[in-house]
Each structure stands twice: as C-alpha cells, then as structure tokens.
Amino acid sequence: GVVDILKGAAKDIAGHLASKVM
C-alpha cells in the first residue's frame, strides 16, 4: 500500500544519508 511505499522511500533516503555521513 501507500504506507509501505512511504516506509520504503524513508529507508532508502535514510540509507543514502547514512552512506554520505560514513
């Protein structure tokens, strides 16, 4: 559903931010 898509996008964004910081 839409919530799952939003959760997936949030995880994807968080992963990109984490990789930039590390």
From Swiss-Prot:
The modification Methionine amide is found at residue 22. One of its GO terms (cellular component) is extracellular region. Expressed by the skin glands. It comes from the Eukaryota. It holds the Pfam family Antimicrobial15. It is found in: Secreted. This is Ocellatin-LB1. Belongs to the frog skin active peptide (FSAP) family. Ocellatin subfamily. One of its GO terms (biological process) is defense response to bacterium. Keywords: Amidation, Amphibian defense peptide, Antibiotic, Antimicrobial, Fungicide, Secreted. It comes from Leptodactylus labyrinthicus. Antibacterial peptide that inhibits Gram-negative bacteria A.actinomycetemcomitans ATCC 29522 (MIC=222.37 uM) and E.coli ATCC 25922 (MIC=114.04 uM). Also has antifungal activity against C.albicans ATCC 18804 (MIC=233.55 uM) and C.lusitaniae ATCC 56936 (MIC=233.55 uM). No activity against the Gram-positive bacterium S.aureus ATCC 25923. Shows virtually no hemolytic activity towards rabbit erythrocytes.
